[in-house]
Regions:
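HIT superfamily nucleotide-processing domains
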Residues: 1-108
Length: 108
């Protein structure tokens, strides 16, 4: 989708502080963090929300859930973290590109 904010980040048209990237996923720091560590993990392919996920997206969603903890640990969240997905306008979703919020406070 050409006008999607997160698609523009994936294409490098908008800068972001990237904390992880592979062929299918991109993670970057949230611009309005709600915790000392707050990053978003997104699929590079545009998926609007959990409401539009289909069977072909299942492996990618599983990869997102499996990848998030390793990124969190690299950012100092070995003791734990929160994950959340806002889905649809009524669920608080503001950017309509599927994204997983990962938040926490590093423990010493």
């Amino acid at each position: 989708m050409t006008d999607c904010l997160f698609c523009k980040i994936v294409r490098g048209e908008i800068p972001a502080k990237v904390v992880y990237e592979d062929d299918e996923l991109l993670a970057f720091n949230d611009i309005r963090p709600h915790a000392p560590v707050h990053f978003l993990l997104i699929p590079k392919r545009h998926i609007e929300s959990l409401l539009t996920v289909n069977e072909t997206d299942q492996a990618l969603l599983g990869k997102m859930l499996a990848t998030a903890p390793s990124i969190a640990k690299q950012l100092g969240l070995q003791a734990g973290f929160k994950m959340g997905v806002n889905t649809g306008a009524a669920g608080g979703q503001e950017v309509f590109h599927l994204h997983l919020h990962v938040l926490g406070t590093p423990q010493e």
